[in-house]
Structure formats: structure tokens, C-alpha cells
UniProtKB/Swiss-Prot annotation:
Residues 244-258 have a biased composition (Polar residues). GO terms for cellular component: cytoplasm; extracellular region. Mg(2+) 1 binds at D116, D121, D153. The keyword Cytoplasm applies. It comes from the Eukaryota. It catalyses: diphosphate + H2O = 2 phosphate + H(+). It is found in: Cytoplasm. This is Inorganic pyrophosphatase. Its main location: cytoplasm. It comes from Emericella nidulans (strain FGSC A4 / ATCC 38163 / CBS 112.46 / NRRL 194 / M139).
Amino acid sequence: MSYTVRKIGQPYTLEHRVYIEKDGQPVSPFHDIPLYANAEKTVLNMIVEIPRWTNAKQEISKEEFLNPIKQDTKKGKLRFVRNCFPHKGYLWNYGAFPQTWEDPNVVHPETKAKGDNDPLDVCEIGELVGYPGQVKQVKVLGVMALLDEEETDWKVIVIDVNDPLAPKLNDIEDVERHLPGLLRATNEWFRIYKIPDGKPENQFAFSGEAKNKKYAEEVIHECADAWEKLVSGKSDRGDISLANSTLGNSDSVDSSKLASIPRGENLPPAPIDGTIDKWFFISGAAV
């Protein structure tokens, strides 16, 4: 199953969108791409939103028709994540699992916080840098529970199944064995990344510990069930667009509606302010 991207507008502009296509037809990365890539449910599909080492805060747009990837904004301005020394941009290929949802109406019994109303976040730790809209096949290794502004914001740790290291990584302790320091750096990155923007340090559940593969799979299962309730009308959709081209439900759209999406264009990125590359030195950050 091969997916391609359809890019609209210049990167680093308010108009830029990345749609995902299957066989040339736009699909929703939130609703149409299956969570599992094999019958055994051991390989999962992940949508890359933010490639490693980049700063533009891009995400699946929950509210827009077919949920394209766009750059997040704050007060009308494009959002870029700051560089907190010694890090540069994101440490991993960052993205989301399709057909998952962190229900904002449900308080998790262990984190004591409600879901963040987004698809489940994923950190892919393989060696290749991805691209926005890439659909990677990954295997699950573990999960961290960030508490972001009083919401549970799970971060699932995965690796691309085609990565040379993938056969050696089967659970969270293997990550520390083969990639020493990465989990500690991941904890620090999420803890401090909002400080340059005047926000307080983020907190973690479980004292910042990364839970194992079994725990992560339970979280994924819960979020997949929550998505099922969302698309079947059992949960309040709020502002979320449930438009899709494959589910065969009341929100499914036909090809005439899909034709309303503009044709793709491969435009160069717009210039961005050089201060995006500034390093911020955070007191108490480990080096």
C-alpha cells in the first residue's frame, strides 16, 4: 500500500497544506489510513508530521476537511519550536498514529489527567530523516506520559521496521542498551521545550519513566477504541472533521468532493527569520 503527498502552497506560510494520497486520491491521515499495517497487529502505520532536526510545529489539522498537515499558529503567527541547548529542533521523526484519539472527556486512571483531543503522538527513533506526510511502518517499543498543561499527552516510542537497528529493538530497555542517553534526552526535551516561550516546565507521569511495550500497546488500544467511538458518533466530535473516503459511514465523501482539493504544487519554502536557529540555554538542563 503506497501513499504519496500532495503539497499546496509554500512551506512556512499560513496557506501551506500537505494532503496524503492513496492511488492519487486524497485520504484523511486521521481517519482513512489504517492503524495496523499487518494482520498480526505487530506493525503500525505512523504519519510523520515533523522531520527530525526541524523546528516548524506541523500537525494534522483536526478541524479541516480531510485533515491535511499544516503548520500550527499562535495569535496568527506560525509556530516554531525553539532550540534548547544542546538540542536542535525535534530529536526524532515526530508524528501521529492514524485512527487514534486521546479523548478529552476521559481522565486516565494513572495519569489523573484527561486526553488532549489529538491523535496519539509518536517519536520514531530510526536513522533516516522523514518528511511531512510520510507514512512509515513502525514497531512499538514503549511510551512516556507527558502532562502538558494539565492534559495527558502520551509519547509513543517506535522505530521504523526497515531501520538497521529494528531487529535489535523489541522493548524499551533495548533502547537504552543500543541508544544510550536517548530516553533521558527525550524526557529533557519535552520537559523544557516550552520554557523559551515563557511557559513553565512540563511535568511527566510515572516520574518521567518510559513504560514498556506492553503498556504502550494498551495505551494505543485505548486510543483506537476512543477513535472508534468518535467516528461512530458515540463521543462528541466538537470541531473535529470526520470527513473520510474509506469508512463507508455518514461522513464519507465521494470523488466529486475530493476534487475540491487544489492540485499539488512543489513550491520552495518561504524565507524564515534567522532567529529560529537561536540556541536557548535553560538552567537545570542536563548536558
